Amino acid sequence: MRATTSGQQTTVAFESGEIVLLAHDDLGETVDATPRLVVDASGPVMPFADRLLVPTAGSSIEIIDLSGDPAPGESAACTGASDADTTRVGAVFTCDAGAVLFTREVGGALAAEPIPFPVEAPPPTTLSGRADRPDLAGVAGEIGAWLLDVRERRWTLLRSEVPLIRAVALGDDGSRTVVLDIDGRVRVLAPDGEVLVRTEPLLAASVAAPALRDRVQLVVDARHAYLTDPADGAVHEIDHRDGRVARTFTDLDPWFVQQVG
């Protein structure tokens, strides 16, 4: 099962190919009448502008309506769609050769635009950012992190002296990126890769075990970063202005974290 969220809607995709579309405002009532359809998707299905963006056959992203029928708009080449996220600019898919940006044009039609990866570092498989901001970030192999300014359609490589395992763009005026390194430290990087903030190792046990490392999640808001710690059963709330751990929530078994409200 895979959930993909955009704005006030979430698609839940099952291995059978069934897609359930959830409207957040309706979740307090019932989900019995929510749209359900079966699609042959090879990646995350993104709800966007009252349509669904569907990676198909591993090579393109098609646009369908909420009934599953083809909808007006441009399909886009995308091999190996591995992730999808929304920004203030539009919906972004992570593909083998780069990102693909979908935007809504005047009149409602959707347009697709490729943003190819530069060649100086491995491409990310996921891109993450603060909700409703113009930037996304992802890990660039063992070299550092990629920062994607979606508004400018520009990639910036943030080199790191230690490998990184998570990267999330803040999308603020300073174009900062919050990352988790292989030692379990949270760092805040400037657009040139300078380390502005560095914490003590917070997740030493979690990052040392591959199975637990895969469960670690990092999400950010305007003031804090939230970091799950599966080994200790905790979630750390970190002030990303100075690296101070503001709070730690304990007695948990964190598998998924999402900001709401």
List the model feature ranges, each with a label.
Residues 10, 18-32, 60-64, 69-72, ...:
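Feature marking well-ordered beta-strand scaffolds used for ligand recognition
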Residues 21-26, 62-67, 102-106, 149-151, ...:
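Structural recognition of the beta-propeller blade-terminating site
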Residues 54-172:
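Acidic, serine/threonine- and glycine-rich low-complexity intrinsically disordered segments
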Residues 1-8, 36-50, 75-89, 120-133, ...:
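Repeated scaffold domains used in trafficking and secretory/extracellular systems
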Residues 230-261:
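Blade-level signature of beta-propeller repeat domains, shared across WD40, Kelch, NHL, RCC1
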Residues 147-230:
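Intrinsically disordered, low-complexity segments enriched in Gly and acidic/Ser/Thr residues
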Residues 1, 27-38, 69-77, 110-119, ...:
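A short beta-strand motif characteristic of beta-propeller blades
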Residues 2-21, 44-62, 84-94, 98-101, ...:
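Short beta-strand elements that form the blades of beta-propeller/WD-repeat-like
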